Amino acid sequence: MKKILLIALAVGVIAACKQNNKTGATESNKNFAALTDQYYEEGLKLSPLSATFIGDERYNDLLPNDGSVAYLAESKAFNQRFLDSLSNYDRDNLNDNDKLSYDFLKDQLEMNIEGFKYHSEYLPFNQMFALPLTIGQLGSGTGAQPFKTVKNYQDWLKRVSAFSVWADTAIGNFKKGIQNGIVLPKSLVVKMIPQMQSMIVSKPEESLFYGPINLLPKDFSTDDKRRLTDEYRALITTVIIPTYKKLGDFLQNEYLPKARTTSGWSAMPGGAAWYAYLVRQQTTTKKTPEQVYQTGLNEVARIKSQMDSIKNLVGFKGDLKAFFEYMKTDKKFMPYKTPKEVLAAFENIHQRMIPNLKKMFAHAPKTPFEIRQTEAFRAASASAEYNQGSADGKRPGIFYVPILDATKFNITSGMESLFLHEAIPGHHYQISLTQENTSLPKFRRFGFHNAYVEGWALYCESLGKELGLYQDPYQHMGALGDEMHRAIRLVVDVAIHTKNMSREEAIKYMMDNEAISEEGATAEIERYMGIPAQALGYKTGAMKIRELRNKYEKELGAKFKIADFHTEVLKDGSLPLSVFESKMDAWAAKQK
């Protein structure tokens, strides 16, 4: 879910808190709402790409130079100023909703400020989280950047004109990283180079960025069409292609020779402390890397036992590793011939669970939903992902599936669990319902905590049987494989970054414990190398939601209603897990 990751890093805690106080708004609440209103507006100006992704078009012409010294200073001052402002409020005098807002803001602002001591700007992008890739999605004409009016087209011209300056700053920061020993592993850099080179074409018409011209609205005047076509051709030729060439050449000729052969964050100066911070940030807990690691080992052992049971159920003779190999390679598990067949299979999963969805969820989102094949230019390095729709419902939520070769798309990879996670009722339900709920403060509509958002999506994978899925033992095995995948992450992410586990050792550990190809395991391990601790939030959040569900089922007995539980989990938007747990406990107490 990379787009969501982008929004998390960019918009983070951008917050507004206009809300109705059912018990009567106090002066303190009114002032607090005004403060967070100001915070929201100033935050969007700092994060114009985030504004675009949530459907706010006011800043569609801006591309911040977010690695520059000036931008970083402005961003740090912004966070400190609003943290200082929070001290002017007595939390006890706020209403319940504003207490959640206060706790959210305080937690995130403190984390943001702490993060400035680690020079993340020295690693401006990698093979997965990269503005050069996001720019491609935005500029294709089919992404979050709108291309419906002449102004829309002009906004994009202004925005992408700043790409060259952004790239110069990124190169400068990469060089500072080299000087300070903060560099990416070579194995990641070699993946980044062809990504840049793929954008270099001989004719502007062959460029991904020519897409908006191919999609020019029919109601544009002839003069506007001619002018925009000329301007887009010129920009592609003079700005976009040279910028990608500049980035590719730098990575190839200067950065790659200086990139490190180690895999983990601890190999860099101050890397161990930096990683411990990232663990706390991504899990929204006070857990140490070692605690996360031990949880991972325990979960791997538990899930492995369940996998053995299914292996025995289907009568497979051999150990689990042989069973994994059988599922990965037997042609009967690869029945598709075309990408359309793969996409249709996912839609079939959707249709089969609709009756039970209505029993388990009292509310369904209004935001449209689509299943699409991932664009070719990024498919090789992409995972299946969800791109959120716009809050007004004009842009659908999209479940993207990378299909490099449909004939090799394996049904035992966990298609059902993947759909539950990335699409329905996972990310599409959680994000869309939250965005659509205009009674929520804006920070809850558009805010993001990795452990909550990804934890919810992983929890949804555990609902398969209740939703009428996982009837086939191989699909159930695929679901267990997906759960195992998230448990393995707790082990290898921490081991890579704190225990000197090599890239190759991590790939082997993953392949030994789940049915994944070497290509797939390599992409996953390199993801953890490039985005440390991000993958830890999934299992951490899912275990918390499941823990609370089990507790309330036991405490409430017949009074526990699963649809009401899911409504409460989702209704207040993304929260740090500690704040979320307190809120849920208060809800459960009212059910007794």
List each language-model region with its residue ranges.
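N-terminal maturation segment of proteins
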Residues: C17-K592
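Sec-dependent N-terminal signal peptides
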Residues: I4-G12
